[in-house]
Amino acid sequence: MSRALAAVGVAALTAAFSLFGQPLARADPDTCPPNCDRIPASAWIDPAAIPLDTSYAWPSPAGVAVFLQRPRFRFEEMCASPPTADDPRDFAVAAKANLANPPGQWQLQVQVLHWRGDSWYGGQLADQVLRSAATALRACRLSAPSTSPSITTDEPGRLSSVLSVAGAAPTVLHSYLVSHPQSGTVAELAMWASSPSAENWPVIPDAQVLDALVAPLCAGYIASCR
């Protein structure tokens, strides 16, 4: 599809997702071509690379992930972020893995979002979603005055933050987001706990977690990084 035709067909593509839901194409469960109707098992972060794995022995997110429509990031719930008009996530192929622990322990959420079709277009959407996330984080205190967001990494395709919530149930959230324009994919890792938490947060560079999120996407979406 040429870029001109793609631009004309955007509205039709969005309508098709709204009317028919999940596309009919099928693919191998472990890997996917760029045009894929699910999140492949190989696209998820290695559980050993998730913070506090030595304490929690996280299972593979792929094993507990569920299909998701209109995904939103964890920080948006804590920030009470208002909906975004024409949000590209509304027609993304997405899945979410929630790994819950008892109160006081760290909770984990991992999401992967993918836009089907030409990678140049999906890549634009992925980058747009990440830029919008950075804007929403900066506006968090406007919609949720009890929050204190701190963006610790804000680079092209990479966003991490620490969000503290005051009040009767103080909470801290560590959030990591990456966009991967080569495959038209966004991945999120979010971990939160009541403050003070039962386990101390480890000293870990943002880049280490962000790299671990993006690393499997080349393998998961075959030919996307050639």
Residue ranges and their predicted role:
Residues 21, 30, 73, 134, ...:
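Processing junctions and N-termini across compartments
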Residues 28-96, 226:
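N-terminal "mature-domain start" segment
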Residues 36, 116-119, 167-169, 195:
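Residues that cap or initiate secondary-structure elements
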Residues 57, 64-65, 70, 74, ...:
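Short Gly/Thr-rich strand-loop-strand
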Residues 91-127:
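A short acidic-to-branched-hydrophobic micro-motif
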Residues 145-226:
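A short, solvent-exposed beta-edge/loop patch
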